[in-house]
């Protein structure tokens, strides 16, 4: 696992009325600071990759749909520099994923339904000076194969 990445499996409390699950608590120390909460939708087959931040951490949650999430450690001072992690997240595998600054991240929408992401950041978005650096989805250094392997 890439150094500094944190995974929190979510516990659903279900009964005949539906379910309840806690997402983020102030006593968990997942985010150093709350900056912004955002909500986005992506359609089946979409790949949104890669980008990274120099100043902010991200905390991702996918309440609907299914995602293949790919992380790549770019940090020069990291003991896991150059490592890749892959997570399968979404409505069938509910979890939170903390992505530290300096770790490139992206996702592919799996299946035939749209994907919803709700994410929290440690800084508010500044359109005049965005803390967002982009890397092509097919970057050779990262070298990730986004194709589904049929086995």
Swiss-Prot record:
Protein name: Spore coat polysaccharide biosynthesis protein SpsL
Family recorded in the similarity comment: To dTDP-4-dehydrorhamnose reductase.
Keywords of this entry: NADP, Oxidoreductase
GO cellular component: cytosol
Gene3D superfamilies, alphabetized: Jelly Rolls
Pfam families, sorted: dTDP_sugar_isom
GO biological process: dTDP-rhamnose biosynthetic process; polysaccharide biosynthetic process
TM helices/strands, residue ranges: none
GO molecular function: dTDP-4-dehydrorhamnose 3,5-epimerase activity; oxidoreductase activity
Pathway: Spore coat biogenesis; spore coat polysaccharide biosynthesis
Highest taxon of source: Bacteria
PANTHER family assigned to the protein according to its UniProt record, in alphabetical order: DTDP-6-DEOXY-D-GLUCOSE-3,5 EPIMERASE (PTHR21047), THYMIDINE DIPHOSPHO-4-KETO-RHAMNOSE 3,5-EPIMERASE (PTHR21047:SF2)
């Amino acid at each position: 696992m890439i150094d500094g990445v944190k995974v929190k499996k979510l516990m659903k409390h279900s009964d005949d009325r539906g379910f309840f699950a806690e997402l983020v608590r102030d006593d968990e120390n997942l985010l150093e600071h709350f900056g912004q909460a955002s909500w986005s939708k992506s359609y089946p087959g979409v790949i949104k990759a890669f980008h990274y931040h120099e100043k902010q951490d991200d905390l991702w949650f996918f309440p609907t749909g299914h995602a293949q999430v790919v992380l790549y450690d770019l940090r020069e001072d990291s003991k896991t520099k150059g490592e890749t992690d892959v997570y399968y997240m979404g409505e069938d595998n509910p979890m939170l994923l903390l992505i530290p600054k300096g770790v490139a991240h992206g996702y592919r929408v799996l299946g035939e339904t749209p994907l919803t992401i709700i994410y929290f950041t440690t800084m508010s978005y500044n359109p005049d000076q965005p803390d967002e650096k982009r890397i092509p989805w097919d970057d050779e250094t990262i070298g990730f194969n986004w194709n589904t392997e049929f086995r």
